[in-house]
Amino acid sequence: MAFPQTSFFTCVQKLQAALQRWAGQTVPLNCGDSFRLHGIDQSNTVVGLDDLFFVVQDDHFRPKDEVGMQLLNQELINTGTLRNSFFPQILMTHGENLDLSLKFLFQGRFQVTVYQSRADHDPVALIEKILGSDEMAAVNVPIGAISALPRGVRLFWVARALSDACVLFDATWQAQAPVATEGRMVVVIRTFGGAAEVQRLLASFNNQSQTGDYGQMLKNTFFIVYDALAAKNTPPYIPSGQDYPLNVFVLSGPNMGGAGNLSLELLALQKAAAGAGIAVNELVVADDDVSLSLESLARHWATTLFRTDQAFYTCPIFLKSEPRMMWEDGGLWGRYTQENPSGQRRAVAPRLLRHAKIFHGSDHLGDMARLHHPEYSAFIFLSLPFDRLAQLGLPCAMFLRGDDIEYSLRNIAAGGVTVSNPNLAAWHEPAHSYAQEYMSIAHGVIINMAYGQRKPDDLATFFHRRAAAHLSLSDVAGLTVYAEALADLVACDRLLQPNFAPHYLSVIARFKSFDAAFSVMADELVASLTASSAREGKVTVTAPFLYMDAYSGTDPLDHVVLTNSHTDRRCIYDPFEPDRLAALSSVAARLYASLSVFIQNFDTLRAHYRQKIAASADPAFWLAEAEGKSFEVLHGE
């Protein structure tokens, strides 16, 4: 297809030139070259989280990142933790067989012990060595073929100083390249209003690059940032006048949501890489507000160098606000949920795997060592072979919510799998709003129809139950979300359509008025309101703003307090205010009318949206979306 002569094409040409310059300085791996699989992660900046990085005990030294790790006699470093244990199962299953070794760069005298550990078993010492040198020295400790390790094993090492003034400069799990590879990885990040978050992430990578041997990985990694509608006063992504090790290209364009911005970014990358005639091996999609260490990114690069299949790779996601809590490690869509415990795809909800696990010390590490295959991965962190992109197509036009689930299920339908890498970890914060719920439901129903749900009964029951809950509390806002999602689904002219973004932007603007009804309110005020209602023989109901239970109490309602836990804001209203009841009746009538159409035309709707997913995944769809729009290169020309 001929590329339109637009400003988008101009950006692609500039990206092509940047990729050619990058390819000229990447460092390929030749057969037999040693490479770094897994180093020490010292990126913790959260007070009180040390035990996720190193075992904390009386004789344990907490390492600094200045001039190595300086230890006194009998002080030790124990890496048997979440962030510094080595979990080899993903390599054993999805990669070439590698000969493993542990390389120490040190000065002084150390006792080094390598342990293996499995779930429900005490750690077993594999190797113990005494290392000694008055000068800085490097020693390789051979471990053996990775295929010879037990399934579900976790490896870690303990180094104890046997004299004063010992220094451990570095320690890395290493392997030798079984074949040659270019080893090129592209990381794509898209943002709308989150430029500062992306800049902080890149700055953290720059700072951490000084603390480890990341040179080859950074030379072989190219970052592309799509900053939608970038503000004119946005600070530069890369500080001027500094020796900067990251290869970064930033472009700006229209805001088409997370999915649309990503598809435009990937389309530009595909066209530019093809025009430059260069091979890209791995593609990483990362969120703009993710917190990820450079060590995690380096481990990921090494893990994918000699992959033997086209699996999607993801990683455990922890909460920024509760950094010991894992929020998800991938998930299943519409199956094995509380509402639908079966394996059939019947629910419009995810089953988050390893959800809400709390990590202290070695808790859950045996479970983490096992191979973990979720059904889908969020675009918080997802990686795939670059060639897989051409086979699967681009993310479809879902603006926000569900685009990553659909893409993962598309991969499975094409014979792929998703696997989580426990050697990595990312921190992120979930959010939810009325507009996001609209998109979650509308897109969730489309996903179910496209990937397995062949009858409308369970979906109809879902809408009936949600309507009953919101009607019982006279909640106009929540009921409107489901009414509008259903109406737009059955209309067939609003979702996954050409020029799709304006519809979503209008939805977001419309639902912001509902969000604006929420405000910060002290607990004691809610308690006073509750007590006042009780004195009058009535009840004030406090409920989440979405997914509340239907009110079934016998006491008459006095007030309703809806809470959005993501924003810590509340909305209080009188459920029997006349205008509210009139609006509630009108919205309910629209919802049930749309639901009737949905049930009667389910097969037609299912065929329609399956076709629309395929159409909006085609590069031609996104070329048309880009036509006539304004784009600009902000950095990397």
State the predicted function of each range:
Residues 377-381, 390-409, 415-421:
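Donor nucleotide-sugar recognition loop
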Residues 276-291:
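Short beta-strand-to-loop acidic/aromatic patch adjacent to the donor-nucleotide binding site
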Residues 253-275:
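Glycine-rich, basic loop-to-helix element that forms the pyrophosphate-binding segment
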Residues 295-347:
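Conserved donor NDP-sugar-binding/catalytic core segment of glycosyltransferases
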Residues 205-251:
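Acidic donor-binding segment of Leloir-type glycosyltransferases
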Residues 346-381:
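A recurrent flexible, glycine/aromatic-enriched loop bordering the glycosyltransferase active site
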Residues 170-177, 420-435:
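Active-site donor/metal-binding and catalytic loop motifs
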Residues 2-150, 156-161, 442-637:
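Terminal low-complexity segments of carbohydrate-biosynthetic enzymes
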